[in-house]
Amino acid sequence: MTEQANNGGAASQNEQGAQFSLQRIYVRDLSFEAPKSPEIFRQEWNPSVALDLNTKQKQLESDFYEVVLTLSVTVKTGEEVAFIAEVQQAGIFLIKGLEAAAMSHTLGAFCPNILFPYAREALDSLVTRGSFPALMLAPVNFDALYAQEMARMQSAGEAPATAH
């Protein structure tokens, strides 16, 4: 009987405290271009890879946020563009009960960290369907990127963007 009462009390406290829940993960946009195919397949494969990543977030309604992670990859062999691939991997998250700094970190680092493996897999699948070797992108440290961006904004005298 005591255990049941304690469990019920803990659930009530948890409901009143911070909450985080992944609601949905989806591909928002996906594109692939191989402007020099099929000629590029006959060249020696010595690629240079340029990766750009970006995150953005917006509040959908009270306590629900959309976070979009965009990965854009341009692969060249010599001066020729072999392919350009881009994915916008998005997620809807229920987030409530966080202070402003924790909310900013959650939206700017924690959520993109959840989305990255899905975006990486989508890019690899897209690239291999274009008959190129898989990219096998290395993991990204979104906490470090977030800290760098916050330091840059602080030195520039900018206020951190919020999704509210």
Swiss-Prot record:
Keywords: Chaperone, Cytoplasm, Protein transport, Translocation, Transport. One of its GO terms (cellular component) is cytoplasm. GO terms for molecular function: unfolded protein binding. One of the proteins required for the normal export of preproteins out of the cell cytoplasm. It is a molecular chaperone that binds to a subset of precursor proteins, maintaining them in a translocation-competent state. It also specifically binds to its receptor SecA. InterPro entries: SecB, SecB-like_sf. It is found in: Cytoplasm. It holds the Pfam family SecB. The lineage of its organism: Bacteria, Pseudomonadati, Pseudomonadota, Gammaproteobacteria, Pseudomonadales. Belongs to the SecB family. It comes from Stutzerimonas stutzeri (strain A1501). PANTHER family: PROTEIN-EXPORT PROTEIN SECB, PTHR36918. GO terms for biological process: protein folding; protein tetramerization; protein transport. Gene3D superfamilies: SecB-like. This is Protein-export protein SecB. Transmembrane segments: none annotated. It comes from the Bacteria. Homotetramer, a dimer of dimers. One homotetramer interacts with 1 SecA dimer.
